Amino acid sequence: WYMHPGQDDNLMVLQGTRYVDIFCQKKKEKASFIITPDKVYKNEKLYYDGPAMIVWPNGIFHRIISGEEGSISINLSTRTNDFKLKDNFNIYDLNIYSGEYRLIRDGSDDQPNLEYVFPNDEIKKLFKEM
């Protein structure tokens, strides 16, 4: 499971199928969605007959599986003041009955180094003098 402490997710499926589980720890409630470009099912019942964006706020546990045919989606995520790249992509083991969770993978391990690496110290020094 993922849970973003500082990011709200706004997911729209453009092609294929996405299976999305969400879990609210405060309410201890789970919901399952099947999302296609033109329909949304909630807990296996038609929820909306048309294109839609599925939205969940920060702090909600979620997991997503692409359908057998694959899928294309966009997530227009928004960041809150609590956003930190260091913990945004952590992966958790979640007990949906008790709401207890534990970190099983530090998401920062999967993030790229965003610092530019100069090819040599001479270029770095010349650039810094500018």
Where would I find each of the regions flagged by the language model?
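Active-site region of the double-stranded beta-helix
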Residues: 1-48, 68-72, 76-130
